[in-house]
């Protein structure tokens, strides 16, 4: 992007977020909408703001996010991961605090696939003795 933007890519489940941050007054825009309009759950808003509150940069940056795939929780986690990486791109000294909070590590949990002969991933068919 043009200007002094810092970039970070975040992933969670099947969601991918591309996050751009620059000095500003604290506006967060997700897919062209204000964050409060995009995420309906209060927990999703809290998850997205966690790295900013931890590093005391809540009103320091304007953040632009493009996120796709997954559901609301996965997208919120992907945005948090992307914001964390963008903050580390902006200032590498923030990494220890973000790492101790667990925001740097990508949450590798994915949906387990359904197996043949099972109802779901692990739910077996009912056993009948006779």
Swiss-Prot record:
InterPro entries cross-referenced by the UniProt entry: Ribosomal_Su5_D2-typ_SF (IPR020568), Ribosomal_uS9 (IPR000754), Ribosomal_uS9_bac/plastid (IPR023035), Ribosomal_uS9_CS (IPR020574), Ribsml_uS5_D2-typ_fold_subgr (IPR014721)
A molecular function GO annotation: structural constituent of ribosome
Alphabetical keyword list: Ribonucleoprotein, Ribosomal protein
GO term, biological process aspect, one: translation
Pfam families associated with the record: Ribosomal_S9
Statement: the UniProt record of this protein carries the keyword DNA damage: no
GO cellular component annotations of the record: cytosolic small ribosomal subunit
Superkingdom of origin: Bacteria
UniProt record similarity statement: Belongs to the universal ribosomal protein uS9 family.
Record protein name field: Small ribosomal subunit protein uS9
Gene: rpsI
């Amino acid at each position: 992007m043009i200007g002094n933007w810092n970039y970070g890519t975040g992933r969670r489940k099947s969601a991918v977020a591309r996050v751009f941050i620059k000095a500003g007054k604290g506006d967060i825009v997700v897919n062209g909408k204000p964050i409060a309009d995009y995420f309906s759950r209060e927990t999703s808003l809290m998850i997205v703001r966690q790295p900013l509150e931890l590093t005391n940069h809540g009103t320091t940056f304007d953040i632009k996010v493009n996120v796709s795939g997954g559901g609301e929780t996965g997208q919120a986690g992907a945005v948090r991961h992307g914001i964390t990486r963008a903050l580390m791109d902006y200032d590498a000294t923030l990494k220890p605090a973000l790492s101790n909070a667990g925001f740097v590590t990508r949450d590798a949990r994915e949906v387990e696939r359904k197996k043949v002969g099972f109802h779901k991933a692990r739910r077996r068919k009912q056993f009948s003795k006779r």
